[in-house]
Amino acid sequence: MSAVIAMWSGGEAISSPILQDRGFHYGDGLFETILFEGGGLQFWQRHLDRLELGCQRLGLQMPALSGVIEHLSQVLPIDVRAVVKLIVTAGITGRGYGRDVTEGGLHCLSYESIDVPDKNSVALSTSPVRLSRQPLLAGLKHLNRLEQVLAKRSLPEGCFEGLMLDTEGLVVEGIMSNVFYQK
């Protein structure tokens, strides 16, 4: 099961993405992927906090998301496990890398049901693709994910996830997951 639930630009509902959007041309935007399980979004406030921080850092308008949980609980069955993706872009501000402060970019909300592998048995490999260091983007889920695309392509057959290191060889994240460790 997969669907785009809602898409809007400048506060107005739209039916298809706008190809002149800076998110398509420059990766000028952010996203959050959130697990929907048991009828609710897991760690919703943490995702909102990170999205708000990212919007501040990149100069994007934070979308109004007050009804998202209620809307999802109406369209998704309580027993479904799904990944909800929220995308926020800078919108259309003209050609070139520079942009004016946007009054509202493209915002897209979608979901896809998922099968999660047994959490006690996941094939993991260290990716040969190294993440570059950019302090201004650290901690943000920005739309330029080419390093992760290349890392996923480099995984051995049958391997579910790859461990991503930076250029100094330090553990940063999984290709598609967070990494936590305890001393």
PLM region descriptions:
Residues 1-74, 78, 83, 89, ...:
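Helix-start/capping segments and mature chain N-termini
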